Amino acid sequence: MSERAPVVTIDGPSGAGKGTISQLLAKHLGWQLLDSGAIYRVLALAAIHHDVELENEESITLLAAHLDVKFLTGNEKDPVQVILEGEDVTTAIRTQECSNAASKVAAFPRVREALLRRQRAFRAAPGLIADGRDMGTVVFPTASAKLYLTASAEERAQRRYNQLQDKGFDVNIERLLAEIIERDDRDMNRPVAPLVPAEDALVIDTSDKGIDEVLELALNYINQKLSIAN
């Protein structure tokens, strides 16, 4: 791990565009990419596979400490390939069931502590784009630049609906909206590492913005922060 490698954090709720913008930024800058949400999704999937109760913090923490997961370079559709215990779970961790389960296990303080070092180990030259919910507040509090992407719950539900439809999943948009509102409440009100913008983060509402516009705003901000740091 390189303590001196610059880090840009991108936090925000589900469906705000973090994943897309993070991937584009990492590709544009030629930096490493950390999808922290994928780590929690993998942990949730491992718990489901091993019949571990999602409410059992002790068992989930033990599972987190011994999680056999690898992140490999993927393809254009899935830039990061996720391997759990030798099995490709890149698509499996993107289901709504897995997303909801990830939010539950992520609420446990001991689980977050167990995964903290694993996340920080992604920091390496030439730099890191860290995508998550507490990247700028907890994992990388001294990051070079911090972004917080948000959007209305309705817009995020529509995006998630389109994404899952494209992947062949049968989904109901009203149920998706209800689940997003429920997850927002859980993420924003958990006692440890709640979902909030870092005090020094640039907040971007992506509700009525296209990908190119958000990317340009992010790049301009990052370039400004990095030039000041240097």
Swiss-Prot record:
Keywords: ATP-binding, Cytoplasm, Kinase, Nucleotide-binding, Transferase. GO terms for biological process: nucleobase-containing small molecule interconversion; pyrimidine nucleotide metabolic process. GO terms for molecular function: ATP binding; CMP kinase activity; dCMP kinase activity. Its EC number is 2.7.4.25. Its main location: cytoplasm. InterPro entries: Cytidylate_kin, Cytidylate_kinase_dom, P-loop_NTPase. GO terms for cellular component: cytosol. ATP binds at residues 12-20. It is found in: Cytoplasm. SUPFAM superfamilies: P-loop containing nucleoside triphosphate hydrolases. It catalyses: CMP + ATP = CDP + ADP; dCMP + ATP = dCDP + ADP. Gene3D superfamilies: P-loop containing nucleotide triphosphate hydrolases. The keyword Kinase applies. HAMAP family: Cytidyl_kinase_type1. Belongs to the cytidylate kinase family. Type 1 subfamily. NCBIfam families: cmk (TIGR00017). This is Cytidylate kinase. It comes from Shewanella sp. (strain MR-7).
